[in-house]
Amino acid sequence: MKRIFTALICLGSLCSCVDYLDVVPDNIATLDIAFNNRSSAERYLTFGIAYGLQNILTPLNNYWDGEERGMPLFQAIRDCNIFIEYVSDRNRVAGLYETERRRWLAEAKVLKAFFHYYLFQLYGPIPIIDKSLPIDASVEEVRVSRNKVDDVVDYIVRTIDECYTDLPKVIQMEAVELGRLTQAAALAIKAKTLVLAASPLFNGNTDYANFLDHDHKPFISQEQSTEKWERAAEACRDAIRSAVDDGKHDLYDFSLDATYPMPDELLYGMNTRQAVTERFNKELIWSVGTQSTFDLQINVMPLITPGTNNINASNANSYCKANYAPTLAVAERFYSSNGV
């Protein structure tokens, strides 16, 4: 009997199912899951804000495609476009109030405008990415062309103008919403864009007369325009008015916090210094708070490359960035009395 039972087990082990196992695991990350409720959709939005945590202290940072310690801002723009597409559908994101929907869409649109502005200030004429391309897009669809500077600027301004009024004037719950956009922040981005566009770099700069597109037309306008300065000035007035009228912003004044009288020179220096270093002072319009000192440490440490010491190069290069480190040329401008 035991032999018969053993033989049956052996025969059973030689058999198998005709079809492959066709079971899809639960909770696979998809866009539909990302936007099926309010909480996950809001997390998607905050990822867009996180792309702004970057610096321009070194030209090695590549924001075009995210290399050399830069952030891939075209990927950030795609994330914004996906968010706008899904949240605009009122059949998605269960539990989302209409006022929240309008605010979130405005935030995503202004973030998209900001990322276009950031790329514009680094690279000049850039392609305008207003919609996310499908995964199966053809090569011709993916090969987008750079747009002229004036078109890029108009797109950024138009995107902000159509939605900034849906943003709050001030952040009421700073403990959970610090870093979220306000009307003043959106108008400040618009103003910075128009000031840059009116500057001599992009306003009639004949040094770029030979910088042409495929139609042999200049990417940068070759005619100076006073209207661009007027438009920029008006945008600056709007941004200042919005920041001051909300009651939370003003020019920083150190004298209001000074306990004892101070010489004018020292007071001037403290005003200049503290306006930059004092956390969340009144001049700060848009910021993301952090308590970590690790970022400061990795940015001031020398960039370690293979062969310089015995530290593991793969780990060192991922942490030591030297973004805040002066170059040798700068150091040599400040010799001591002993020559070093």
Language-model segments: what does each one mean?
Residues S39-G124, V139-L178:
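Conserved, well-structured interaction surfaces
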Residues E107, F114, A188, K192-V195:
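Contiguous, well-ordered alpha-helical segments that form the cores/surfaces of helical PPI scaffolds
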Residues K2-A7:
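Sec-dependent signal peptide recognition
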Residues L178-A186:
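Short amphipathic alpha-helices and their capping/turn segments at secondary-structure boundaries
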Residues V18-L60, I126, D130, Q183-A184, ...:
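An aromatic- and glycine-enriched ligand-binding surface/loop that stacks and positions planar moieties
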Residues S13-S16:
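C-terminal motif of bacterial Sec signal peptides marking the signal peptidase cleavage site
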